[in-house]
């Protein structure tokens, strides 16, 4: 009897695992459907070439290129094919590994998009809580605490627990929707991508600087970990 109960328990665990896995795949599919430009970031996260993904997904490389550039909309069928193609390209036998990698990449991209939306709102409203004029040029100064509070209230794909700022780098620690811990990092290349998103969103030239409080130049008159955004 005990063995029978244990067998049922194992079957239930496997069923829950599969259900959870399918839900994660649906999140990734929906992200590709709404934002096909994310495909490139997903490829880069899993270290997959465009030609390899084209082969495994059954989508031509030229079509894939147009999707990544935002010049073609994605359909449900394409989003599903790309998601399965990404998984097929991954060499590990553990299917959870690439899904977690993709969810981490999605969290990073959503963080960037949400941050860009936040900055755009500051500029549109002329919010003096963040905007300053330094040598007659507008500068946004966002403390770590304000960034944390805003992103917590806006970001849906993960629950943010804390944000750490170091020179030129942002680290975000939190949990996915299934309560698994996630850490995402924005280094120099990610911040460059974030600058481009800001420029596209605001129509302005943008330079982003990240400082721990001990390294903030005196001209900014703030003694906190902060993100400083020059826009003109």
Swiss-Prot record:
**Any idea which GO molecular function terms this record carries?**
DNA binding
Cross-referenced Pfam families, in alphabetical order? HTH_3 (PF01381)
**Which CDD domains does the UniProt record give?**
HTH_XRE
Q: Which UniProt keywords apply?
A: DNA-binding, Transcription, Transcription regulation
Q: Where's the DNA-binding part? A: 50-69
Q: Does the keyword Transcription apply?
A: yes
Q: Which PROSITE patterns match?
A: HTH_CROC1
Q: Is the keyword Methyltransferase assigned to this protein?
A: no
The record's SMART domains line, in alphabetical order, gives: HTH_XRE
* Residue stretches making up the HTH cro/C1-type domain: 39-91
- Its recorded name reads Uncharacterized HTH-type transcriptional regulator MJ0529
| Source organism of this protein record | Methanocaldococcus jannaschii (strain ATCC 43067 / DSM 2661 / JAL-1 / JCM 10045 / NBRC 100440) (Methanococcus jannaschii)
């Amino acid at each position: 009897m005990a063995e029978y109960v244990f067998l049922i328990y194992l079957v239930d665990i496997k069923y829950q695992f599969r259900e959870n896995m399918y839900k994660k795949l649906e999140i990734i599919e929906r992200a590709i459907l709404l934002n096909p430009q994310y495909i490139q970031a997903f490829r880069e996260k899993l270290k997959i070439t465009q030609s390899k993904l084209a082969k495994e997904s059954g989508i031509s490389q030229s079509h894939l290129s147009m999707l990544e550039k935002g010049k073609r909309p994605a359909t449900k069928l394409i989003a599903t094919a790309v998601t399965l193609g990404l998984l097929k390209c991954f060499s590990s036998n553990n299917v959870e590994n690439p899904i977690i990698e993709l969810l981490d990449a999605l969290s990073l991209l959503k963080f960037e998009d949400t941050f860009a939306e936040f900055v755009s709102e500051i500029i549109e409203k002329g919010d003096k809580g963040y905007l300053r004029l330094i040598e007659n040029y507008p500068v946004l100064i966002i403390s770590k605490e304000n960034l944390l509070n805003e992103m917590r209230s806006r970001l849906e794909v993960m629950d943010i627990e804390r944000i750490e700022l170091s020179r030129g780098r942002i680290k975000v620690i939190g949990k996915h929707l299934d309560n698994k811990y996630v850490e995402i990092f924005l280094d120099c290349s990610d911040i460059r991508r974030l600058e481009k998103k800001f420029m596209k969103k605001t129509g302005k030239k943008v330079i982003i600087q990240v400082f721990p409080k001990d390294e903030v130049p005196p001209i900014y008159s703030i003694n906190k970990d902060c993100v400083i955004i020059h826009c003109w």
